Amino acid sequence: MWRAGRAALACEVCQSLVKHSSGVQRNVPLQKLHLVSRSIYRSHHPALKLQRPQLRTSFQQFSSLTNLSLHKLKLSPTKYGYQPRRNFWPARLAARLLKLRYIILGSAVGGGYTAKKTFDEWKDMIPDLSDYKWIVPDFIWEIDEYIDLEKIRKALPSSEDLANFAPDLDKIAESLSLLKDFFTAGTPGETAFRATDHGSESDKHYRKVSDKEKIDQLQEELLHTQLKYQRILERLEKENKELRKLVLQKDDKGIHHRKLKKSLIDMYSEVLDVLSDYDASYNTQDHLPRVVVVGDQSAGKTSVLEMIAQARIFPRGSGEMMTRSPVKVTLSEGPHHVALFKDSSREFDLTKEEDLAALRHEIELRMRKNVKEGCTVSPETISLNVKGPGLQRMVLVDLPGVINTVTSGMAPDTKETIFSISKAYMQNPNAIILCIQDGSVDAERSIVTDLVSQMDPHGRRTIFVLTKVDLAEKNVASPSRIQQIIEGKLFPMKALGYFAVVTGKGNSSESIEAIREYEEEFFQNSKLLKTSMLKAHQVTTRNLSLAVSDCFWKMVRESVEQQADSFKATRFNLETEWKNNYPRLRELDRNELFEKAKNEILDEVISLSQVTPKHWEEILQQSLWERVSTHVIENIYLPAAQTMNSGTFNTTVDIKLKQWTDKQLPNKAVEVAWETLQDEFSRFMTEPKGKEHDDIFDKLKEAVKEESIKRHKWNDFAEDSLRVIQHNALEDRSISDKQQWDAAIYFMEEALQGRLKDTENAIENMIGPDWKKRWIYWKNRTQEQCVHNETKNELEKMLKVNDEHPAYLASDEITTVRKNLESRGVEVDPSLIKDTWHQVYRRHFLKTALNHCNLCRRGFYYYQRHFIDSELECNDVVLFWRIQRMLAITANTLRQQLTNTEVRRLEKNVKEVLEDFAEDGEKKVKLLTGKRVQLAEDLKKVREIQEKLDAFIEALHQEK
């Protein structure tokens, strides 16, 4: 016990000593400090200089488990025991800090290099999208100039607001730990997850296949999108061309327009373009010269043409058909090597690879656009102009390659179509046939040589070209075979000249310069030239180009004047026919007639806005009543009128009117308004305009009317607004003056008399002719009509006895009528009695209602004063006044919608339809027909061709 007391006293002494010596109270225990921080803390803290490093000293020295003496608590000598430790702690601290710095620096350098390497790998995996920049409109790249990012940044929420919406990560971690515990406990779901993991490996092949299908689908969608925008671009270019033509034709006073002089070959190319359209329209063929390039598929036609044009301008494929439609290439000399299409103003710089790729892509798109669905090739021609220094002036037509077998994916008639296209061009007696033959294949496999020999058996306009001579020299065992081909002894055909060319090593990425150098180098070192098997003027594409150009212009000078004379005769015949048949009419072609019809149609649409409001409301009110009168009388008035008191009548009417207004009435009103607008529009479009009316526009006007009506849709909010207006109108029961009362009675009488007339006709058809018609017109009743007549007479007797008989017959009354008829020898069925009763009672009721209507003429005073007179209750008059007022208000509302909105929307639809028809040439040909239109079209085309031919001939003579 005394030891424990001494130990406690010693602890208190130590604690007080430490507090007095330190002067600062610590909040953090020393054990919780870092190792380095603890050493610094010991060295600098004045209290710790007086203590041992071990804080458990008190416990160790004064515990009951030890027998150590108290003399160890002497404090004075202990302060010198820490002197060596105080001398070395800065060195240890510096060593540790330096080690930490190297670790951090090394990690940063290694991590940065790894991150850069990973980023470069990811960057290489991303495909190059620069080829598709042209798809994105230009304004996308300039969009940052129109967006104020500062305003957007201010509109975005602050980081504090976003932090409030952030998920609670602690809760998510807790949920994930629970899920982990759940699955690690061996739940049944573990098996399912493992099965899924094993199944994922088996699905890899399916994923690869599906990814390939997605890529193919995206490529197909991209192609369709390109074709769509290609059509839009062509339409805009066509409009731009027409506007440019109008601007050039406009003769402004005081402004001198300089006439641009065209080259001779450009003028000739324009003549061929016009003739091509004329030939396609009238299924004829002109006889003007052009160079027709024919050959077997993959024989090198396109390569020869590219060597002549000195540019890789055509799309290429390894063994597959790439030329799907004829391509007319007009070569002319110019300072810059450029290409442009006939219907486009864009120039492709053929010295730039980007423009060359764009040109090839454009040609491929145009070919696909020309090919109709279900076909592989098309006879429609693509016209391309190529200008450049050193080019020989001529016009060449590249045709699809002749094939021997139709492969899968081709249309069944592909072979015949290619033959017919080739024959159509080669049948021209002035066409120069450039026959391309692959020298690397056996001559016996040639298809085109037989076709050429049929079209030009004497060889007066055929030039034979043997391609791939380098491969032929390597593969052919006997070089004399090539000599036989060039001399025209091997093939069963004749030609003006024979040429041998080399069009490269088969690499599509080769440039024209590289191919030309390879060709010259080959022929310089070739055994064929060294052994005089080939002559120098028969080799290289340059010599071929010069020879073809000379032959082309020789043909042009010999045949162009004869062609011009034939068109002069055609023009004279057409003009004479027009003067004899249409002496007082101008020669308007289809486009001019369409513009004239367009103006007439727009004038007729504007006439809709001239219709008076009174006329609109009258026809709307009348049409609406004709549409709803049956429902009002049969389903509202007649059921309510069967009641015996005023309260039940009004209740029934209000319920049925409310149901009718909520469901059917607004829709019926809109339908009536739309039909009324159609009728008025049709009336203005079809009514004759007197002697000036031209029936040639009737089909066009009818088509425009139908298409405009089909596109027009009434405003969606019209029914909702009408429902409120009609409901409020039907809720009003207060007739303010005698004039409105009389108008309601007149409206009611007119409606009931119409129904009574229909009922009388139904009864007459049921019972047959009366005695007057039987005597005058010699008509007799049938047996059934006689039975109906006897039944009617019996039922009328019943009504005379009881004028207030209800609407339905009781079973005993039916039995009584049947027995009375049987007593007179008339057998009748109960259903026949009911049918006859319906018409008889309906006539009786309508006559009673009309008599009551006459009584109510003088009942306005009682109604206005609210007198209760059971003998004169005019609730039915009030009902018809409510209906009449609803019709008037609805007609007024619909008239406002028509004049303010719908007429303008219809006019807009008509303009859109006319614009669509103006762009659709087939539609105009279908709608504007007749001998007069066709004759005007022929005259216009022939005049244009003759004018261009005369201008070309004049320029040709000047060049001589």
Curated annotation (Swiss-Prot):
One of its GO terms (molecular function) is protein-containing complex binding. The modification N6-acetyllysine is found at residue 228. GTP binds at residues 298, 300-303, 317, 468, 470, 503. Residues 467-470 are annotated as: G4 motif. Residues 321-324 are annotated as: G2 motif. The record marks 194-195 as: Cleavage at site S1. Residues 1-87 form a transit peptide. Expressed in brain as well as retinal ganglion, starbust amacrine and horizontal cells of the retina. Absent from nerve fibers and photoreceptor cells of the retina. Mg(2+) binds at residues 302, 323, 398. Its EC number is 3.6.5.5. Residues 88-96 are mitochondrial matrix. Cleaved by OMA1 or YME1L downstream of the transmembrane region in response to different signals to generate soluble forms. Cleaved by OMA1 at position S1 following stress conditions, generating the short soluble form (Dynamin-like GTPase OPA1, short form; S-OPA1). AFG3L2 is involved in the regulation of OMA1-dependent processing of OPA1. PARL-dependent proteolytic processing releases an antiapoptotic soluble form not required for mitochondrial fusion. Residues 295-302 are annotated as: G1 motif. It catalyses: GTP + H2O = GDP + phosphate + H(+). Disulfide bonds join 856-874. Residues 589-836, 874-928 are annotated as: Stalk region. Oligomeric complex consisting of membrane-bound and soluble forms of OPA1. Interacts with RCC1L; RCC1L acts as a guanine nucleotide exchange factor (GEF) for OPA1 by exchanging bound GDP for free GTP. Interacts with CHCHD3 and IMMT; these interactions occur preferentially with soluble OPA1 forms. Interacts with PRELID1. Belongs to the TRAFAC class dynamin-like GTPase superfamily. Dynamin/Fzo/YdjA family. This is Dynamin-like GTPase OPA1, mitochondrial. It comes from Rattus norvegicus (Rat). The lineage of its organism: Eukaryota, Metazoa, Chordata, Craniata, Vertebrata. The gene is Opa1.
